[in-house]
């Protein structure tokens, strides 16, 4: 079975090592991070750049939608929420989304879901599973968030068909955060989590 690697950095670890992160990213990554006014956003940006640099020394390229990639692979995708910054890595197109599992007012968000998904939310299905499943597929295909309503959230786990291609999605809870990983394949995959505790 194929393996998807999931690297995680706790935001507290990243804060503790901010000085080291500043030394481990290039000048453009540093400039990008320091443009953020909020320090937590600076640290998230630095940690994300650190993860990308750890993966490859190749220059980053960007597709038409702005999704970063390496010319010679591997495929990767980054997300952050709450306590964590995560990066999923695969030999095929990949998307990841993480959301802190907390109470949320659904009234303003229900419009982004199709009828079946909205019904599930109204019947108390977990919003974050639906959101993460949608978001990870959007990120896998490198599409715009403007298309979110047409992106299928279901199933949370298993094969889904979109635009004539098969994707396999896995959703799970890790330390009070919901994570969805979507990969361009109809084959299941295992996830190997690597927690980065020192930088």
Residue ranges and their predicted role:
Residues 1-199:
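Core catalytic alpha/beta fold that binds nucleotide/phospho-ligands
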């Amino acid at each position: 079975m194929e393996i998807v690697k999931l690297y995680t950095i706790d935001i507290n670890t990243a804060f503790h090592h901010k000085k080291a992160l500043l030394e481990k990213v290039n000048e453009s990554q540093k400039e990008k991070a320091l443009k953020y006014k909020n320090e937590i956003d600076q640290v998230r940006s630095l940690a994300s750049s650190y993860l990308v640099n750890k993966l490859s020394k190749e220059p980053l390229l960007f597709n038409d939608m702005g999704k970063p990639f390496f010319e010679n692979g591997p495929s990767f995708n980054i997300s952050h929420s709450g306590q964590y910054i995560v990066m999923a890595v695969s030999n095929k197109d990949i998307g990841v989304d993480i959301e802190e599992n907390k109470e949320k007012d659904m009234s303003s968000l229900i419009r982004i879901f199709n009828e079946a998904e909205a019904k599930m939310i109204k019947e108390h299905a977990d919003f974050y599973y639906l959101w993460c499943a949608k978001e990870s597929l959007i990120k896998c295909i490198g599409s715009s968030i403007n298309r979110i309503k047409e992106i299928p959230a279901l199933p949370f786990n298993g094969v889904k068909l979109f635009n004539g291609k098969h994707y396999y999605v896995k959703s799970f809870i890790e330390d009070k955060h919901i994570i969805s990983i979507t990969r361009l394949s109809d084959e299941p995959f295992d996830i190997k989590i690597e927690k980065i505790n020192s930088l």
